[in-house]
Amino acid sequence: MERIMINPLLSIQNSPTKFLKPPLSSIHRQQQQQERQSNNNTLFMGEARPRRATTFACLSIRRRRNNNGVSEFEETARFEQVGGKGISVLCGLGYWVQGSRCFPWLALNFHMVHSLALQPSTLQLVQYSCSLPMVAKPLYGVLSDVLYIGSGRRVPYIAIGVFLQVLAWGSMGIFQGAREVLPSLVACVLLSNLGASITEVAKDALVAEYGLRYRINGLQSYALMASAAGGVLGNLLGGYLLLTTPPKISFLVFSALLSLQLVVSLSSKEESFGLPRIAETSSVLESVKKQISNLKEAIQADEISQPLIWAVVSIAMVPLLSGSVFCYQTQVLNLDPSVIGMSKVIGQLMLLCLTVVYDRYLKTLPMRPLIHIIQLLYGLSILLDYILVKQINLGFGISNEVYVLCFSSLAEILAQFKILPFAVRLASMCPQGCEGSVTSFLASTLCLSQIVSAFLGVGLANLIGITSSNYSNLSSGILIQSLAALAPLCFMHLVPMSEPVIEKEGKRGISKRSRRNRRVGRVVDKESVTYRRERESEEAQR
């Protein structure tokens, strides 16, 4: 019995007309391709792929296209038709709150120094030990990729992470024992970082998946702007509140912001974003094992592993003395919280400006010389703390407040900016289907290297005798830190010389497997079958 299938491109069934009559020669196919390329300024109804043609309804209008072949008008129309407003509110608020986390952390640092009277090394140990949940980000990413909660695999994880943060910061704001007893305070901070890491992984995966699905550019820039805006406002608000209110008020205000994010997350429906549902498998454990195997295979490639090793080692081998410097600024120099908060604001603005400069001017430069310059500047910028500790700035007529405002955050900003070229490179080389896993693995390894750096700093502070009543050897520790930051320049050969060359699909051609996957429907016709066999034989000869 002859079986006739539906061609979804034409939506016609059981028709005697031969709509897929093959061309006579390969020359005819080349002419048709040239004609299609000459019409690249025409915005036609539907997409080249039938899967996308059934998703959007695009107007037939002539408009100039961008580099990706999608006009700004079409991009805006798609964004509105496929849940763009909902994802803007959900992720925009999420990244803004994520950037605002510096606001309660500033209050927490002052609380641990003044109320709990922690030593500088103990303060730094608590700060970075509580970041351990961030190390497990790849696990959260794999679970979010393969395990559905209800009808979604992104938004429910965002809601769960936000709820954990509300529980942690709300407890520290309401219950005195949760913030006055160190073990309970550490437990609350661990719970908060666990929720933040789950939320960040799910949110990053949602933005990446949505942008790739609908070929919408600029979502990452939008996320960065929202996070930077949250950081600026969070530091301003944190410095102001600490001058007039106790730290618990800052915890409660941030809990209110998280509650707003939780309401938005619970009211968002992932189905409205039009994202495809992955095929269900017999076992979730098998899917997790497969995803972990793919991640392991991806990071073993030299193009990914070598620059990742350099980035991780260059952070881990530098002993961090941020806790000691913070205690010195607040206990010896008696700087107001508003001054420290404003210095963080200036640092966030500097980071945003550096990111824009990199995207426009520095992205095309060879990677190895660029990283070499950034690392050299980072090692030298650490000496700015040496100038502050030795009070050399007063000899030039620069007060401590002005000096901290202008130069205190420079080393921290350069350390963050150094990661950007590596993140761009790894994102451009991620195998298909492993984007979220590889990026979360990068984030977790960088977090682990920062924890190792903090522990080395604690050991160095104890070795040279830095305490809350004795900062005489802090300048020596800063010199050691600066020399350690210059040491990674000795193995710059691990950093690639240039960015990977990504060929466009139109230039490199389409493989036989891709052609086979792009065929739509099937019409039982001897001429069509014969033509397909002849075409495959021609490709094999080529």
Swiss-Prot record:
Biased composition (Basic and acidic residues): 522-542
Location(s) in or outside the cell: Plastid, Chloroplast membrane
Record's function text: Could mediate folate transport.
Protein name, entry field: Probable folate-biopterin transporter 8, chloroplastic
SUPFAM superfamilies per the UniProt record, alphabetical: MFS general substrate transporter
TM annotation in the entry: 103-123, 132-152, 155-175, 181-201, 223-243, 246-266, 308-328, 338-358, 369-389, 404-424, 446-466, 477-497
Domain of life: Eukaryota
Region (Disordered): 24-45, 506-542
Entry keyword Chloroplast: yes
Compositional bias segments (type: Basic residues): 509-521
UniProt family annotation: Belongs to the major facilitator superfamily. Folate-biopterin transporter (TC 2.A.71) family.
UniProt topology in membrane: Multi-pass membrane protein
InterPro entries the record matches: BT1, FBT, MFS_trans_sf
Transit peptide: 1-78
NCBIfam families according to UniProt: fbt
GO CC entries: chloroplast membrane
Gene3D superfamilies given in the database record: MFS general substrate transporter like domains
Pfam families associated with the record: BT1
Chief location of this protein within or outside the cell: plastid
Keywords, sorted A to Z: Chloroplast, Membrane, Plastid, Transit peptide, Transmembrane, Transmembrane helix, Transport
